[in-house]
Regions:
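Polybasic/polar functional segments that serve as interface/processing modules
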Residues: 1-84
Length: 84
């Protein structure tokens, strides 16, 4: 488990994201869609199939991209909200 300091805001992208995208592309999405600097907050992107998420986080030292794939089940979709 990677410790996340208290006070870090977590943003969940609605809809689905192309999971082939890397750190720079996802950071650019955050900048263009939310008009936010991606440094300091944690951003979660869900894949189309629902069993994979990518997590983008800058901890002050550098950008990290984490991936989690479920063996069974799917991550919750927030499709009723506006995608960013």
């Amino acid at each position: 488990m990677i410790p996340i300091p208290s006070g870090v805001r977590v943003w969940i992208a609605t809809g689905h994201t192309d999971m082939r995208r890397g750190m720079r592309s996802l950071a650019l999405t955050v900048q263009e869609s939310l008009k936010r600097d991606p440094h300091g907050d944690l951003y979660i992107f869900r894949g189309r199939s629902g069993d994979l998420v990518n997590i983008l986080w800058h901890d002050g030292l550098g950008m990290s991209l984490y991936a989690k794939r479920l063996d069974r089940g799917k991550f919750i979709s927030y499709g009723l909200c506006q995608p960013f």
